[in-house]
Amino acid sequence: MARHSIKMIALLTAFGLASAVMTVQAAERIAFIPKLVGVGFFTSGGNGAQEAGKALGIDVTYDGPTEPSVSGQVQLVNNFVNQGYDAIIVSAVSPDGLCPALKRAMQRGVKILTWDSDTKPECRSYYINQGTPKQLGSMLVEMAAHQVDKEKAKVAFFYSSPTVTDQNQWVKEAKAKISQEHPGWEIVTTQFGYNDATKSLQTAEGIIKAYPDLDAIIAPDANALPAAAQAAENLKRNNLAIVGFSTPNVMRPYVQRGTVKEFGLWDVVQQGKISVYVANALLKNMPMNVGDSLDIPGIGKVTVSPNSEQGYHYEAKGNGIVLLPERVIFNKDNIDKYDF
């Protein structure tokens, strides 16, 4: 009888240990949130995140609001926290609107990261950053300058919204560079498409009609750039320089037809992968302070940089920026090498 009891205890203990291991494994769930679903740029980032999850044995859920709103993202964050997710990675539609929800999540032990578009740094641990505002603002102006070869020119800025963190930081730097290096360029308007394809096309056509002598549209937004290109084709404006940021799959026909000579971006699939690998490092309690590096299969080494790289004044332990290794300028010679 005693021997039978000992066996039962041993079996129950083993079952308990196995259950504990299974619980830990099941708890390693990461939510990857875009500004909104249905946009190729964000879908590609989500694909990269889920590929990394499969490689690491982590369940990565990709979900976002159907339109870019703070309330939509907050609802998703709260839902994922209540479902017991261990980490949330979000492309924030507002630098501060998500902060109360994200801080509550961190207080409950959830790891919070941002990708593509940041919050205030105190509202997350790490920002997986495609490039500093200075890098990306300069990139926009340089692409325009390759085509606008005159001292006096008229330029329009066109992107998603006046409140989104990342694009406004880039545009601020781009406008500063224009002021310093191209003082003869007049910025005639700054307008927004609000991440809506139909509204973006209408806005782009309105800009072109309102400024018939416009020389360039700078559109650092995945919806605004193709909308500007389509508007130029619709209105037969062949001599208009159109530059900005979007995905190669969306922009390929405009490049092939010569409407867009060049545009830029970064490997957003890679950005999704890096985000999940960094989140996994946090879940495994690996060292991730400023100066620490992480080797990512197929990508290489990424390093934690201080928040000051993004122009912030907030620094703390376990907090910083992870920059993508490189950015890409696409043109007719290289665009077919990319598929995202």
From Swiss-Prot:
Keywords: Periplasm, Signal. Residues 1-26 form the signal peptide. One of its GO terms (cellular component) is ATP-binding cassette (ABC) transporter complex. It is found in: Periplasm. It comes from the Bacteria. The keyword Disulfide bond does not apply. InterPro entries: Bact_Solute-Bind_Prot2, LsrB, Peripla_BP_I, SBP_2_dom. SUPFAM superfamilies: Periplasmic binding protein-like I. Part of the ABC transporter complex LsrABCD involved in autoinducer 2 (AI-2) import. Binds AI-2 and delivers it to the LsrC and LsrD permeases. This is Autoinducer 2-binding protein LsrB. It comes from Salmonella typhi.
